[in-house]
Swiss-Prot record:
Similarity-based family: Belongs to the IspH family.
Residues annotated for isopentenyl diphosphate binding in this entry: 41, 74, 124, 225-227, 269
Function description: Catalyzes the conversion of 1-hydroxy-2-methyl-2-(E)-butenyl 4-diphosphate (HMBPP) into a mixture of isopentenyl diphosphate (IPP) and dimethylallyl diphosphate (DMAPP). Acts in the terminal step of the DOXP/MEP pathway for isoprenoid precursor biosynthesis.
Record-given protein name: 4-hydroxy-3-methylbut-2-enyl diphosphate reductase
Disulfide bond positions: none
Domain of life: Bacteria
Pfam families: LYTB (PF02401)
UniProt pathway: Isoprenoid biosynthesis; dimethylallyl diphosphate biosynthesis; dimethylallyl diphosphate from (2E)-4-hydroxy-3-methylbutenyl diphosphate: step 1/1; Isoprenoid biosynthesis; isopentenyl diphosphate biosynthesis via DXP pathway; isopentenyl diphosphate from 1-deoxy-D-xylulose 5-phosphate: step 6/6
Amino acid sequence: MKIILANPRGFCAGVDRAISIVELALEIHGAPIYVRHEVVHNRFVVNGLRERGAIFVEELSEVPDGAIVIFSAHGVSQAVRQEAKDRNLKVFDATCPLVTKVHMQVARASRKGTKAILIGHKGHPEVEGTMGQYSNEDGGIFLIEKVEDIARLPMQENDNLTFMTQTTLSLDDTAETIAALKEKYPAIQGPHKNDICYATTNRQEAVRELAKLSDLVLVVGSKNSSNSNRLAELASRMGVKSQLLDDPADIQADWFNDVKTIGITAGASAPEELVQSIISRLKRFGANSIEELQGLEENMFFEVPKELRIKEVN
């Protein structure tokens, strides 16, 4: 069997930054460092940070007063920020700057009293944090996941409306939903550029090319990773078998029935180290050659917070 690697794949700038923030906080301040929610959605990464002294919690009530806490790359609501401030917690914010950009759009709509529609997945921490930027009772923010949800929206055609999206959605599904929104609400406003981030876009486009050449696409990523799930779904939509995995032990022999070419990609929160471990495991199942596709070069970089950056330089 032949392995073809998608390019780009794996870590994005926001994930790199978030992991660096936890690592530097541990190095400078020592354990324990509390992290609200998994800093990124990858079991391999989270377990590694936990072994170094990071304590992952779902609510700030689990964090002692005055302790150091890191907000995950997915972002948090204004209520969570206020709670941290009220409890005198030392906060390092690992929210991806591209998520923060969407937060600013929602906050602007809230200040103006413009009703906002967020396209995203219910229950995802990014969605919860984004919706939590809206506080104006005279307006409101409403979540939709798909075209069918639009019919249940309470707004009128002539209402002052704006929309935003989660950063890790399917490009195709989101384009369809936005088109349907604009059809029902012709005057609706939206971002000048799609809120779906560069890494999500690039990895989905790379999977389109990968799927054309593969009998099976393996997506390295955890089950709670939105962008990783979208990659597996996209390959399946293109008529190619796909599997999502985040451990070499997940691999099953029957995946390779009638498979000559295995395509491999990785979600934005999956490390290259894990990809290479999976490749090593695949060699035991008969994979004997590796090819890497040409792809877009990503040079995006996000700085860590100033307090950590100064220590890093010194």
